[in-house]
């Protein structure tokens, strides 16, 4: 089988690594340059998108922000999975909210803002405090504002109006502020015949809006809620592939915050922690193969490496530590790689995270240090 991935970043790279044992070949389309490249070396493959579409068996995507003309060409080929509808819902908060409502899953009360009058209505409908998010283009905490009191209204409106004016069809989605206890996510896969397999929930810790630490957890009640909502969304979309749902945990009740119609950062722990990783299961699904087991095989946490292109050599010598570099040029705040940390039981994982905190820079890895301080207190 030959799969073309729209996007040539780390997710396409890790799909390629996961596909090799199954004899699934991966090419990647760089939407920025328009080049078709090898996902590991990024070497040009010498042909364009239309040629690639002709010779591959399946087309999929590693991210949501794909030009609609590219999506249309791929969808028309009959080879694209999941559907362009799913990708668009992941890249436009208005469509995402409509999907969640249609699927009947809990999500924060919201109002769409395109004008100042809409903003006034949103304040009446949603109330203060509220969270305001750009409908298009926002990720990792970007394109977001918090309205905490009425004194901010004019200033925030000026910023949001500039955001709306800068991009055609842009809007702002106002959401009620949700006083959640923690953020969790569920990664799951749905096959062509409707088979669904979900991984254990992961608890996520963000720093400045960017995922820093993600740990697989055992929470039967939350797991049941999350699987029910995953199934509702996946079946509403007739989804094929891996899908991620991010939730707020509010006193034991889950609300969907976002969906990601693709393999997801909070599922990287599955590379060492699950029977079958999310990348392999995505390829299995879109290629029409049976889904692999999502069973937890060891306690695992994933630590994002942000803006750093080296680690202390001692990390490689630590038991249970697995480093995954993405081959990117160093840039402040950029996702350069991740570390999966494993233990045979919870206490062993916690001790290994604390050992890592002793050698990793606190400024670069604040979530690991915060975890260690709490665990050792």
Curated annotation (Swiss-Prot):
Keyword annotations of the record: ATP-binding, Ligase, Nucleotide-binding, Purine biosynthesis
One GO cellular component term noted in the UniProt record for this chain: cytosol
Pathway: Purine metabolism; IMP biosynthesis via de novo pathway; 5-amino-1-(5-phospho-D-ribosyl)imidazole-4-carboxylate from 5-amino-1-(5-phospho-D-ribosyl)imidazole (N5-CAIR route): step 1/2
Domain of life according to the entry: Bacteria
Domain ATP-grasp: 97-287
GO terms, biological process: 'de novo' IMP biosynthetic process
GO molecular function: 5-(carboxyamino)imidazole ribonucleotide synthase activity; ATP binding; metal ion binding; phosphoribosylaminoimidazole carboxylase activity
Pfam families linked to this entry: ATP-grasp, PurK_C, RS_preATP-grasp-like
Reactions the enzyme catalyzes: 5-amino-1-(5-phospho-beta-D-ribosyl)imidazole + hydrogencarbonate + ATP = 5-carboxyamino-1-(5-phospho-D-ribosyl)imidazole + ADP + phosphate + 2 H(+)
EC number assigned by the record: 6.3.4.18
Binding site residues for ATP: 93, 133, 138-144, 175-178, 183, 206, 257-258
Assembly, per entry: Homodimer.
Family: Belongs to the PurK/PurT family.
Described purpose of this protein according to its UniProt entry: Catalyzes the ATP-dependent conversion of 5-aminoimidazole ribonucleotide (AIR) and HCO(3)(-) to N5-carboxyaminoimidazole ribonucleotide (N5-CAIR).
HAMAP family reported in the protein's UniProt record: PurK
Stated name of the protein: N5-carboxyaminoimidazole ribonucleotide synthase
Protein source organism: Vibrio vulnificus (strain CMCP6)
Gene: purK
